[in-house]
């Protein structure tokens, strides 16, 4: 869905299509995901770039028009397993991964680049669902990209400017 570099690059499946393929026998298919992470990172590095803002760690709760099929899925354990394999491939190619969109953009419909976006879920709801991939993968990530969302029951500031979320 969002692959900025196209001409001369391998067109990769969306993460959701990849996850659907993997559901048939995910443990045996994870090395394929590692290979895709390596392939993407290798091609980007070969073109002189040293970063890719991947992978998307948002959970797809079928509410977000922005995240959609860029998400691996709605199951935190599946997202963790597939993202970890993809990150491993990126790292093997020599690229750090950037997990996005912390702490999770999958629960709202609006495009936070175009309009103010607010999520009213509690911290405990986020901790048991959306935050799980970020927490599980934090030591594998070179960085995170924040969501431009206000989680108004936690902090009125959007995450990008929130001391609560950034510290």
Provide a role label for each language-model segment.
Residues 1-79, 106-119, 147-156:
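Enzymes and membrane/adaptor proteins characterized by extended Gly/Ser/Thr/Asp/Glu-rich
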Residues 78-167:
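Second-shell residues forming the walls of enzyme active-site clefts
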């Amino acid at each position: 869905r969002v692959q900025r570099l196209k001409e001369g690059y391998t067109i990769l499946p969306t993460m959701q299509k990849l996850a659907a393929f993997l559901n048939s026998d995910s443990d045996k298919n994870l090395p394929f995901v590692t290979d895709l992470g390596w392939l993407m990172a290798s091609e980007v590095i070969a073109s002189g770039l040293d970063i890719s803002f991947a992978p998307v760690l948002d959970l797809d709760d079928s509410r977000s028009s922005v995240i959609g099929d860029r998400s691996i899925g709605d199951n935190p354990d599946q997202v963790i397993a597939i993202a970890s394999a993809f990150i491993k491939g990126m790292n093997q190619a020599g690229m750090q991964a950037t997990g996005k969109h912390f702490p999770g953009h999958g629960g709202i419909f609006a495009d936070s680049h175009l309009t103010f976006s607010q999520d009213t879920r509690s911290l405990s709801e986020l901790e048991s669902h959306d935050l799980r991939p970020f927490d599980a993968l934090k030591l594998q990530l070179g960085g995170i990209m924040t969501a431009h969302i206000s989680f108004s029951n936690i902090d009125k500031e959007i995450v990008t400017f929130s001391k609560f979320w950034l510290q």
